[in-house]
């Protein structure tokens, strides 16, 4: 009988501890979200192309060479 009472008290204490820990973790998460609410992510300049690509978007995508793109390459 004593073992059953001890087990019931232990289970109740563990449940209370989990609930209390969950509530405290929720408060910490809200504080962290309020702190991180500002501009955390900043744009990165990846040094993309500075000149216009040779050809239209279709030719670039499929590695084609339409007549307009060929004239542009040849300077005509």
UniProtKB/Swiss-Prot annotation:
Signal peptide boundaries: 1-21
Cellular location(s): Secreted; Host cell; Host cytoplasm; Host nucleus
Lineage: Eukaryota, Fungi, Dikarya, Basidiomycota, Pucciniomycotina
Induction text: Expression is induced during host infection.
Keywords (A to Z) from UniProt: Host cytoplasm, Host nucleus, Secreted, Signal, Virulence
Main location (coarse class): secreted
Any one Gene Ontology cellular component term annotated for this protein: host cell
Family to which the UniProt record says this protein belongs: Belongs to the CPGH1 family.
Chain's role: Rust effector delivered into infected tissues to modulate host functions and contribute to pathogen virulence. Enhances leaf colonization by the bacteria Pseudomonas syringae and the oomycete Hyaloperonospora arabidopsidis pathogens in an Arabidopsis thaliana infection model.
Protein name in the entry: Candidate secreted effector protein MPL124497
Organism per entry: Melampsora larici-populina (strain 98AG31 / pathotype 3-4-7) (Poplar leaf rust fungus)
